[in-house]
Amino acid sequence: MELVAVKEGLARILVPKAERIYDAPVFYNPVMSLNRDISVLAVKVLGPKRVLDALSATGIRGIRYALETPAEEVWLNDISEEAYGLMKKNASLNIDGELYEEGDRSYLWGEKLVVINKGDANRLMAENFRYFDFLDLDPFGSPVEFLDTALRSVRRNGVLAVTATDTGVLCGAYRNACLRKYLAEPIRGPLCHEAGLRILIGTVVRYAAKYDLGVEVLLAYHRDHYFRAFLKLKSGAKKADKSLSQLGFLWADKSGRFEYRRGFLPDKPGASGPLWLGPLKDESFVEELLESARDHPLAHKKTLSFLQLISEELDVPFHYDTHTLARACSLTPPKLDVIIQRLRELGHSATKTHFSPTSVKTDAPFGVVAEVMKNV
């Protein structure tokens, strides 16, 4: 396996040389550096003591946690023998200390403890009940097969950070797969990315409720080919009930009109869901991320601007795609800034959204938005 050096954040690691990243024997995706930037900032702000990167590959995520955050104990895990060897090599390159090996586990002792494990992620999480303050699930595809053990491996009031890269499934391109994996009906069209993210969160909420765990969304977003959510777990049946009460269903038509309602079952045909209808961010948490990002060695040039966009985004369910509305009204789409300004002049809240460059988030009803589109 030929290796090349790459730098990301404060880490300098070795990764396999390959023409296509998916052909490499150990996976490393530079596009996900923004994801890792935000994750590092989250750990820095939250200050957990024990962190697990359950699916580590090269080890870049866990190594950055060890280098760039106050975490005292960081675990890296992968089932691949090649990944295990590379994780040990990369950890030793970046973190001072002596490496001790015991079977399929190595310990790097220095200012912090870095544990490098070769094994099945589900088994590792099952063996460490309520041990980790921050648990990161960043799989290839769906995280569903890891949710039961992950939820039970996080301490009370700990955080589960979960990624899903099966956007085609959650966005409705593979409806049957979404029904199987997420037990939810997806939606196609301009709302698919927000609905897909909310289906993912709704699935975690339903899994967590089995263990009397409620879910508080600190931050959830869509970017590139993936969905990402930082979820604080709250113990107690009442907390679980409260989270379940935030689930519901979405209806949308080709004109861009949508409606949503909370409830355990849909009350009319054509519904998408169940999905999360609660907030997608904790505003104070996002502000802390932004503040921390301004003086942090970020790996991706767009991390700061992306967080800024999310911080300014109106946190209401779903958005109006102005191009869809324009087609329905036989109009040329007006400039988004003009639409937002006019809605604000009418007394409504309105912002851009990270889900789509042609959409507006607003508390204005469909009729008002359509009328603004016709008259600006």
Swiss-Prot record:
Binding of S-adenosyl-L-methionine occurs at 36, 61, 78, 120-121
A GO BP entry is: tRNA N2-guanine methylation
Keyword S-adenosyl-L-methionine listed? The answer is yes
CDD domains, per database record: AdoMet_MTases
Give the Enzyme Commission number: 2.1.1.216
Q: Where is the Trm1 methyltransferase domain?
A: 4-373
Q: Which UniProt keywords are listed?
A: Methyltransferase, RNA-binding, S-adenosyl-L-methionine, Transferase, tRNA processing, tRNA-binding
- Domain of life, source organism: Archaea
Secretion signal, residue range per the UniProt entry: none
A molecular function GO annotation: tRNA (guanine(26)-N2)-dimethyltransferase activity
Family, as annotated:
Belongs to the class I-like SAM-binding methyltransferase superfamily. Trm1 family.
Name of this chain's protein: tRNA (guanine(26)-N(2))-dimethyltransferase
* Chain's gene name: trm1
